[in-house]
Structure formats: C-alpha cells, structure tokens
C-alpha cells in the first residue's frame, strides 16, 4: 500500500498545504515516470518545466505543470512525431491537443531533442511566471540511468534537460531571467 499527502508550504501566510502537485508527482512515479531533477541536488535538470522535477511546485502546488511531450510519449499516451528531414511544422500547445516533435541525432539514436509548445493554459497555467513558447528538451537516453532513477545525477552530463533560449542555465527559481528561457530556439 502506498500513501501520499501534500507538503506544507512555509510562506508569509503561515504553514499551508501545498496543493496537489506533490501527489501528482508521486502518482506519476506509480505510472512509471522517473525523477527528472538531480537527486544529488547539484544540477539543473528540467526545473519547473516538468512535473517530475520542480513543476509540481508551480502555483504553490495548486496548479502543477502538465506533463511534457516526452513524459506523455513515455507513458504511451501521445507518441512523439519524429522529424526525419527538413520540414515546417506548427507547434500547437500540448494542453490544447498539440504533439511533441523528436529530432534524433543520426550518429547516436539514443540522443535527441524534443520540441513542444508550452502556453499558460490548462495545467500549464502555473508556468505563468516562467514565460511561454517553444520548449526544447535534450535527451541522452541511457537505460541504466532511467531504470535506476538517476537521469540527472551527473552535473556535467545531464541525461534530460531543457535548453534555455538565452543559453543561460540560471533559471532554477522564478527569476528575472525566467521569461527568457522559452522565447525562440
């Protein structure tokens, strides 16, 4: 039997339950998703862009972010569309029925990029302080890392992380640079 409850959020209004974010994160583990944060707490990982990292804390856990295109694919809910040649596609928001696109490294099929559109609608409404637009996620799949829940434990070799549009990995929290992360490629 597994039990899960909300965490307390310590803030100016006192100790309040954080909302459903942590429960959503833990249920997602039961469905088969790994942690995408650095379980050693030395690297960035996916930050607030993933429920399996800090996204469960969006809006104090009351509106955790939606699942990424990668996570939806991993669960078998919405497959990624592989882009194999130069083409033009329209990225509709995931929360409005859009799909994610996968661009594979021809030299290493376990390394690829996932492109998705994140907007402030549905579950992604909690991302309002972080900007919106195209999210580019770099994946360097390693079966052992995924099976052992160690995706991002090596700060110099992240197995799954977002690529900031401004090329600065400083956006761990809601900072003034946060909105720059998704605009453009």
Locations of regions flagged by a protein language model:
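General N-terminal targeting signals
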Residues: 130-132, 153
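Extracellular hydrolytic enzyme modules, especially secreted metalloproteases
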Residues: 1-129, 140-142
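Extended polysaccharide-engagement surfaces of secreted carbohydrate-active enzymes
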Residues: 27-36, 159-164, 171
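Intrinsically disordered, low-complexity segments enriched in Ser/Pro/Gly/Ala and basic residues
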Residues: 5-8, 160, 174
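Beta-strand-rich binding/interaction modules
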Residues: 132-138
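Conserved small/polar residues in nucleotide/adenosyl-binding loops
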Residues: 174-181
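Acidic Ser/Thr/Pro-rich low-complexity disordered segments
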Residues: 143-170
């Amino acid at each position: 039997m597994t039990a899960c409850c909300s965490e307390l959020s310590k803030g100016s209004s006192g100790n309040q339950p954080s909302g459903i974010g942590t429960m959503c994160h833990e249920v997602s583990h039961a469905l088969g998703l790994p942690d995408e944060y650095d379980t050693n707490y030395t690297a960035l990982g996916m930050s607030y862009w993933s429920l399996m990292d800090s996204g469960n804390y969006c809006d104090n856990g009351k509106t955790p972010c939606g699942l990424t295109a990668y996570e939806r694919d991993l669960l078998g809910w919405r497959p990624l569309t592989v882009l194999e040649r130069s083409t033009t596609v329209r990225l509709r928001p995931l929360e409005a029925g859009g799909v994610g696109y996968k661009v594979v490294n021809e030299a290493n099929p376990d390394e690829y990029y996932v492109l998705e559109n994140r907007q402030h609608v549905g579950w992604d409404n909690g991302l309002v302080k972080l900007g919106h637009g195209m999210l580019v996620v770099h994946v360097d799949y390693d079966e052992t890392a995924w099976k052992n829940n160690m995706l991002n434990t090596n700060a110099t070799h992240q197995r799954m992380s977002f690529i900031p549009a401004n090329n600065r990995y400083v956006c761990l929290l809601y900072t003034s640079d946060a909105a720059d992360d998704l605009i453009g490629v």
